[in-house]
């Protein structure tokens, strides 16, 4: 905990302002009164809890080390702490009933922010090599519809593809990402983005801790030049549910972006009065983003 305090003190002395959001990610089994008190004393003001599911069978399918009992215990400890929860859907053997139960358990917690992610199977992972019994596409779509209905009924707004909150509880770092703001990553495996009107530079630090200690130089440096900016911009800006006023963006949009954007307007996928999608465009976001290739 002392190391965390030193890092946050160094950051606070250089970069942060009065309204800085400082989020610390934890798994439920890592939560204890002592740890939370220490984090709050160090300056953390938001806890991100990786619940994923309230059902032990689904947690086991995900390879998680915590269980439903540890989630309940963590909830008690965090009851007076600004908290966000991660949940997943599309989990192996997950049913509409168990997914609905997960949402109801979340809603009963009194927490004001939810990150809701669909399980995606990436190549070269343990899940990719296994035979999985995942929910069918029609059930995935039904889960998304159930989430929209229940969350909106309970005062939550979808402000980004995977993010729901009550008004005033939106994640500030999420908003920065999807408004195309820059960010600085510090530590093993961290990502950064630095941009101007002509190019975007993205880079990642070495991930294994031992390798990072030996060599803290940047790896995976990627420069996106003017000709390729359109897609990168679209993949970020169009995730925001309510769109953007151009004057609020931290980057000047290229002429080529607007040429492609006009096509999206004509197809009923993009808005005329601001940078964002229509309901149809948001529902078919991947197809909408294809316009910017």
Residue ranges and their predicted role:
Residues 280-293:
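Short, amphipathic alpha-helical interaction segments positioned at domain boundaries
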Residues 275-279:
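Minor-groove-contacting beta-hairpin "wing" of winged helix-turn-helix DNA-binding domains
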Residues 265-274:
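A short, conserved structural fragment
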